[in-house]
C-alpha cells in the first residue's frame, strides 16, 4: 500500500479548502498513491463557529471530493464536521476508491471541541492494498487505548488527522510532545503511523506542521517542515 499524508493550510472557507484538496488528490493520483490523508477539519476549517456551518455545503463538497477520488482510483481521508440528529461530530471521512463512505468520530475532545462537538466512541478499521488501517483524530493520539485496540484488531497502519492550532508561544512549546506521541504509538503497537497536520494561522492561533510517517521501530521515515505544504508518502509492505 503506497500511502501518504497531505500537510496543508486550512481555511474557514469550504470552497477554498475543496480547491486545495482537489489539487492534492490529483497530484497523489499522478504519484501512484492508494491512500491520502488530510488534516483535521481540512474541508471546513477548524478554529470557527461550527453551529454556523451549512451541513448541505459540507455534504456537497464531500461528494465532489469522492468523485475526484474515484476518478483517481484513490482512497481519501478528509476531516469535516458531521451532522446527525441534532449533534455535530468532529469526523474523519474515508471516501473509498470502491465507492464506500466510512466515518470515524473523534473520541477525545479538546476544550475547544466541546463547545460544538459530541464525542464518538468507536474506531474505524478498513483495508487498502492488503494492509489493515485505522484512524485517529488529533487529541486521540494522547491516549494509548485507541491505538492498542487497533493493534489487537490486526491494524498495521494508523492515520492521524491533526490541527495543532495554539497561540504562538504554546505552539512552539507543544512541538516536542506532538512529535513524540505518534512515535510512541508506533513503537507500543508495532504499527506504522501516518500523521497529517495543518500549517498556517487561524485567528490568533498557528499550526506548525511537522506531519510525519513513522515505522513500527519508531524510526521517522519522512517528516515535513513547519511552514510548507507538501505530501509525504511511503509504501507499506506487511508480511
Predicted regions span which residues?
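Extreme N-terminal starter segment of soluble prokaryotic enzymes
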Residues: 1-4
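Active-site catalytic loop in hydrolytic enzyme cores
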Residues: 83-157, 166, 171-180, 237-238
Amino acid at each position: 500500500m503506497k500511502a501518504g499524508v497531505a500537510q496543508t493550510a486550512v481555511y474557514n472557507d469550504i470552497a477554498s479548502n475543496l480547491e486545495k484538496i482537489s489539487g492534492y488528490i490529483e497530484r497523489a493520483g499522478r504519484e501512484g498513491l492508494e491512500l491520502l490523508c488530510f488534516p483535521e477539519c481540512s474541508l471546513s476549517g477548524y478554529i470557527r463557529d461550527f453551529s454556523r456551518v451549512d451541513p448541505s455545503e459540507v455534504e456537497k463538497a464531500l461528494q465532489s471530493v469522492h468523485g475526484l477520488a474515484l476518478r483517481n482510483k484513490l482512497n481519501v481521508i478528509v476531516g469535516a464536521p458531521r451532522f446527525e440528529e441534532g449533534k455535530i461530530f468532529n469526523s474523519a471521512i474515508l471516501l473509498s476508491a470502491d465507492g464506500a463512505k466510512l466515518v470515524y468520530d473523534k473520541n477525545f475532545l479538546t476544550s475547544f471541541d466541546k463547545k460544538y462537538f459530541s464525542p464518538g466512541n468507536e474506531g474505524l478499521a478498513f483495508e487498502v492494498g492488503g494492509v489493515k488501517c485505522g484512524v485517529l483524530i488529533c487529541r486521540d493520539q494522547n491516549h494509548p487505548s485507541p491505538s492498542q485496540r487497533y493493534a489487537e484488531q490486526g491494524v498495521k497502519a494508523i492515520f492521524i488527522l491533526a490541527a495543532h492550532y495554539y497561540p504562538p508561544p504554546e505552539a512552539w512549546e507543544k512541538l516536542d510532545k506532538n512529535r513524540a506521541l505518534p512515535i510512541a504509538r508506533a513503537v507500543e503497537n508495532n504499527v506504522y503511523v501516518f500523521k497529517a497536520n495543518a500549517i498556517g494561522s487561524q485567528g490568533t492561533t498557528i499550526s506548525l506542521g511537522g506531519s510525519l510517517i513513522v515505522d513500527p521501530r519508531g524510526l521517522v521515515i519522512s517528516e515535513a517542515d513547519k511552514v510548507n505544504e507538501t505530501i509525504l508518502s511511503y509504501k507499506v509492505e506487511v508480511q
